[in-house]
Amino acid sequence: GWEGALCYAANHSSDEQELAFRRKMPNVKVFSGSSHCDLAQKVVDRLGIELGKVVLKKFSNQETCVEIGESVRGEDVYIIQSGCGEVNDNLMELLIMINACKIASASRVTAVIPCFPYARQDKKDKSRAPISAKLVANMLSVAGADHIITMDLHASQIQGFFDIPVDNLYAEPAVLKWIRENIPEWRNGIIVSPDAGCAKRVTAIADRLNVEFALIHKERKKANEVDSMVLVGEVKDRVAILVDDMADTCGTICHAAGKLLEAGASKVYAILTHGIFSGPAISRINNACFEAVVVTNTIPQDQHMKECPKIQCIDVSMILAEAIRRTHNGESVSYLFSHVPM
């Protein structure tokens, strides 16, 4: 009887394991904040699901009001919100959305933040400077985020500001694809880093394309103001492709483009993951001699493209959608570091 009981227990536990194994993973729900609804819609279209119902509004005193319009109990929730536009309002909205889902018993809440806010404030560059990127990381965790998906962090060490998993996706595979398909003379190209901080990213792209790379070294005096620039590398009669993770007022890349043409480059392109384009950026690009300024849609670009015909956009919704699908199914995301999903 004793052996029989053991045998029954063994069989019974394997039956239970079998049942647990067959039981479906919790369903996925994707919600969009108000910063970039267009990108969120593209992501869910690729996943073949609907956007979750949510009402986002402001009270008359300008406090953010969030109403999640459907049950998220036991669900795997993804909230898409980029750090652009009204950055502080959008960040607050994201924190409240995360918290609303968390206290409504979502099994896991992932913040999908294509362009991470405050990413440039990642170190003390002068006395008494705040490290705001770390503060944002703390706020996301306290709000209840279990996981972060972002793209081309300004400094990849920001991943270490979190105690939760962070997937820092790369636009690089999509950028390589764009270069090969849209710059006929790319084999005669040279990939240029507009500053030393970007050199690692740029050498990786140059290696993948099997072309040379150049570097522009700049000395800054004040924030958002560029001073002297020194070009290291031979660009004469070559197609120069400037690559950077973000451009804000575009002083650096426009200055760099002039420097490259002075040095004899035949054409100049700029490829940027996050096109913030604030202040005088658009007029600077219009006046600079770029063949094209190529950005991804981690930030809404429709208005910028209307104002500036040189701006072109690479859609990265398929990368974010595939990252969500793989995360939901418990698959590895590292495939996306070197491939563009179809």
Could you describe each region identified by the protein language model?
Residues 1-342:
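PRPP-associated nucleotide enzymes
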